[in-house]
Amino acid sequence: MKKLIVSVIIASFSSFSALGHGDNSHYGSKQDVTVKTIKVTDNINMLQGRGGNVAALTGPEGILIVDDDYKAVSERLSAALKDLGSATPKFIFNTHWHGDHTEGNAFFGKQSIIVAHTNVRKRMMDPPIIFGQKTAPYVSYALPMITYTESMSINLNGEEIKAVYYPNGHTDGDTVVYFVKANVVHLGDDFFVRRFPFVDVDSGGNVQGLINNIASLIKTLPADAKLIPGHGPLANLDDLKSYNQTIVETAKIVQDAMKAGKTLDEIKKAGLPEKYKEAGSGFIKTDMWLEIVYRSYSAK
């Protein structure tokens, strides 16, 4: 493997192992699952298994992937990558610490270079409780070897892959990965297509932070960019705008109720207008979303 020359600041990573988030994605145990490969460009594919979406850049210099799904999917993911050129990625970017995006680190980590934001490594070394579960720290070879605080780039197969930190949205370690020349962007779990997102308040996530991050992305992304979400189908800027509108509008409903002195139970009982029914049909149901928003705006 060619020598990697990058500026690094020692980093951090962590994952929740039996849980995921997204339609039909919250299954951590070993089972029969098919990894679907969806062509995005000539040398970028989106792979869908059981957890978060995986992006794969292919070419003569090796494969780079963004996220690596659950450990139960690793063998099938490796087989799908082999069909694209190599069963073992040269580089792996983790968009955040949750296990449905990172458990595959343990399968690939002895041969692949794992890269993530510094907070990801920290979370992996000491995972917080999530959905009432405490997971074990990641083994050393499953931790990011290279970390950063703001951004970094890798150049491979004629493409610049630029990772940019977006603070305190889905978690406190979220990265958006840009395939600059191809105009393809992996947004990790800052983006759930047509569904309410999971915002991990206990891992530094915050609904207002997510709103701010998505607003920034909408302003800066090219109109014709191809967007790979953390969960859901391949998307575009209009999909991101619609998602952002849903988050902003429902967050305001909760904020207005809080200002009126309503309790969380009262807010849940009131619910949301019918037009948000589809958004609450995924992993994050409407009641859970209302609680996430309430907790975010209650935090001091």
Predicted features along the sequence, with ranges:
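Active-site metal-binding motif and surrounding structural segment of the metallo-beta-lactamase
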Residues: T37, P60-L64, A72-V115
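Conserved beta-strand hairpin/beta-sheet module of binuclear metal-dependent hydrolase folds
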Residues: K36-A80, V177-F179, N183-D189
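Divalent metal-coordination and catalytic microenvironments
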Residues: N43, L57, D67, L81, ...
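Positively charged n-region of N-terminal signal peptides that target proteins for export
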Residues: M1-L4
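Metallo-beta-lactamase
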Residues: G22-S25, K39, G62-L64, Y70-A72, V120-G169, T171-D172, ...
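Extracytoplasmic/secreted envelope proteins and their assembly/folding machinery
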Residues: V54, S74-S78, N105, G188, ...
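Accessory terminal helices/loops
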Residues: V8-Y27, K219-D224, L234-K300
